[in-house]
Amino acid sequence: MNNQITVATLNGKSYYKIINFLKSIELSYNELSPIEAINSGTKVIITSEKESTIFKKKNIIIDSELNENPLIIKAKILRNLTEPFMYEQLIIGIDPGKRIGISIFYLYDEIESIVLTCIECVLNLVCKILTNLNAKRKIVRIGDGDRSMANSIAINIKTRFK
C-alpha cells in the first residue's frame, strides 16, 4: 500500500496533521509535492483544501475531512484503494458482557477492534458506522455472552434504523 496513498501538500500545518493522522490509523504513505502527485499513479491523495483545486482526480481527501471519525476516514481510504469489483461488505461483530468487544471488518479488512464498557457508546459507534459507510451488504452479529444485553443492543439498533 506504500505507493497507493500520497501526502501532497506544501503547507506545514496540513502536512503535520495528515501524517499524524495516517500514523494513528497505521497506514503507510508516500510524500510528494502537489505538482509531482498530479502525474503519480497513486490511488488516494491527501492534501490541503487550497491545494486540492489543482487535482482532477476524484480520490482526493482534504485535510479538513480528517476531523471526522478516524474509523470512517480509514474505511473511505480503504474503499478508494480496493478494486471496483470487490464485493462491498461491512461486518460488525459485538461480544456483549461487562466489557463489550467490537470488531469491524470492511471490504475484508479489520479496520477496528475495540473494547467498550458503555452500551450507549456501543450503540453510537455502531449506528455511526452503519450510517456513514457504504456497503452493498451490512451485517451486525451479536454474540450471546450476556443474553439480556445482546437483546437490548439488537432491539436498540433495529429501532434506530426503522
Could you describe each region identified by the protein language model?
Residues 1-31, 37-72, 76-92, 98-162:
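Phosphate- and other anionic-substrate recognition elements at nucleic-acid/protein interfaces
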